[in-house]
Amino acid sequence: FLSLIPHAINAVSAIAKHF
């Protein structure tokens, strides 16, 4: 499960770049 956390953070970071 912990390995999914960096992926989630990376996804949020990528989405934030659009805004």
From Swiss-Prot:
Main location (coarse class): secreted
Expression (tissue specificity): Expressed by the skin glands.
GO biological process, one term: defense response to bacterium
UniProtKB keywords: Amidation, Amphibian defense peptide, Antibiotic, Antimicrobial, Secreted
Keyword Mitochondrion among UniProt keywords: no
Protein's cellular compartments: Secreted
Residues annotated with Phenylalanine amide modification: F19
A GO-annotated cellular component: extracellular region
Family: Belongs to the frog skin active peptide (FSAP) family. Phylloseptin subfamily.
Function noted in UniProt: Has antiparasitic activity against trypomastigote form of T.cruzi (IC(50)=0.34 uM) and against promastigote form of L.infantum (IC(50)=10.06 uM). Probably acts by permeabilizing cell membranes. In vitro, shows slight cytotoxicity against macrophages (IC(50)=34.42 uM). Has antibacterial activity.
Name of the protein: Phylloseptin-N4
Organism: Pithecopus nordestinus (Northeastern Brazilian leaf frog)
